[in-house]
């Protein structure tokens, strides 16, 4: 096979992958504001300066794009958890802080702080809320359930903690989502605010 032809195909594929990634990020931002049914693919296309027909070349339906946005959203949370759990010492408590129930689980504490850091990306958290709201759709519900189950399993494996602690951890995470949706998150998440949000005083 002609080498130039092969290289051209590889380059085209890479370009499409980059466009796909950009498109999904733009979709997260738009879906975060208007939800699955209220969002126009035309507006998403304008965000990344591509044509609407090209959107449907990459994703046959708007729902396909929404499902891809769900995956990207959960992928980013999982990546944050993995990074935090790999080096929990980065999130050690300052001497002036204490935990209401003792030192707690270091890895779980680190993952909580990593999630608090994501609050600066308000659209990411708002999109999660829109994904939950769209669960009346069978495909969306199945995808969200699959990713939520995977996320809780990952957090449990990374922290080696109890079911009760994991339940409390994700309950606080949902509280963070609600706080973010009300716009009550500061521009920069201060240490004291983050500690209070995930159970530290």
PLM features per residue range, with description:
Residues 1-16, 76-80, 84-104:
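N-terminal capping/interface segment
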Residues 1-34, 38-47, 64:
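Basic, helix-initiating cap at the start of DNA-binding domains
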Residues 22-29, 33, 47, 57, ...:
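Alpha-helical structural segments
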Residues 34, 84, 114, 131, ...:
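Alpha-helix C-capping/helix-to-loop hinge sites
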Residues 53:
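Key DNA-contact positions within bacterial/archaeal DNA-binding proteins
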Residues 75, 90-129, 135-139:
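Helical hydrophobic small-molecule/effector-binding pocket
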Residues 122-134, 148-201:
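Hydrophobic alpha-helical segments that form the core
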Residues 143:
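Short amphipathic alpha-helices within nucleic acid-binding modules
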């Amino acid at each position: 096979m002609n080498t130039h032809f092969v290289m051209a195909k590889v380059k085209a594929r890479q370009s499409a992958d980059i466009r796909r990634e950009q498109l999904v990020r733009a979709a997260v931002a738009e879906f975060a504001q208007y939800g699955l049914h209220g969002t126009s693919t035309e507006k998403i296309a304008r965000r990344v300066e591509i044509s609407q027909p090209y959107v449907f070349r990459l994703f046959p339906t708007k729902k396909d794009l929404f499902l891809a946005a769900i995956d990207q959203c959960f992928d980013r949370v999982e990546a944050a958890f993995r990074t935090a759990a790999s080096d929990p010492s980065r999130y050690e408590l300052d001497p002036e802080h204490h935990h209401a129930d003792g030192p707690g689980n270091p890895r779980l504490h680190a993952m909580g702080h990593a999630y608090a850091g994501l609050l600066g990306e308000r659209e990411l958290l708002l999109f999660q809320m829109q994904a939950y709201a769209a669960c009346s759709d069978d495909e969306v519900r199945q995808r969200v359930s699959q990713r939520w189950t995977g996320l809780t399993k990952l957090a449990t494996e990374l922290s080696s903690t109890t079911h009760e602690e994991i339940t409390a951890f994700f309950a606080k995470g949902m509280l963070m989502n609600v706080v973010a949706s009300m716009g009550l998150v500061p521009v920069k998440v201060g240490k004291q605010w983050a500690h209070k949000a995930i159970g530290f005083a």
